């Protein structure tokens, strides 16, 4: 079974809360604040495992959660950091955010990793808020919240050469001849239901990986048949070998097949269509009219395809020359990473200090994660806490934005359930 897409839920660890604590020692009646910071929450990290070849594991487990950070304690004890959760994925995995459908990462190298959900920062303990005028703060920061999201994993094969062509033209047979791969081979459409990989090793040329891409049919670029699920596997290949049944024993027209497959490639991706393509006229051992090959070759050469090889995968005729040409072409084409446009790239939102302000009559409502975090940290009924509260609003630009919106003396500012009268 080949699983090439998976959807999983990931959740990082929440940051530990800062501690509100004061020294309690014999003979020290009024000890100062000594609340420690909370620990950082664990990250969820995707890590490439070169030994993995499918996303099958994610059909059995779909939810992953990292450890939260420990809370701070007295005596300036810091909370323990939560452990990162490492999730292994195969090379060639594309990571997408489900909500936005944007690409987060392309994990195509053995050493690649990506933090898909960042752990929350630990909150500061009350000892961090001591100033010359505030020597006994009785508030501390809560830990930053965890990140959670659904992500989609897409596996795109890391093959150098892709075999394309209609079903039943001999791609699987060719793969079995040039490598040690043993794909399922039979005489019916869609024999290959998953891409098969093999390593081509020919004396005098560098080894390369070749993939037998499942049969493409007319309409594949629109999802017909095996469609888009398998076209995506061709995207990473640097050279395409287009296998054609030149024998016409099934009543197919080789030239018509050639045009239809290339039309599907062009509709799916112009870049894919422009990739170097070698034509392999297969089943030549069953061709009884040599003029048919010459006629076919002349027609495809008019489209700019000058590398046309007459082969027979069954008898191995012409196969070595075909593979050597593929190796030669590969040596001229550098390996490139997947290009991610700005439109498709996922941009992480800044979640630490986010807020918005809206006006209802003479009331200005401030809301957002910043507001929740601030109100959780302070006691608005305590004068020292309230002074700190107003200082934070000023430092973070809330007061300035309120004045730009035209707030006047006596107007009400509301943050969740807390309200105060604005004074210039």
Swiss-Prot record:
Enzyme nomenclature, EC number: 3.6.5.-
OBG-type G domain ranges (all copies): 159-331
Record GO biological process: ribosome biogenesis
Subcellular location: Cytoplasm
Positions bound to GTP: 165-172, 190-194, 212-215, 282-285, 312-314
Domain (OCT) ranges: 345-424
Domain Obg: 1-158
GO function terms (MF aspect): GTP binding; GTPase activity; magnesium ion binding
Protein name (database record): GTPase Obg
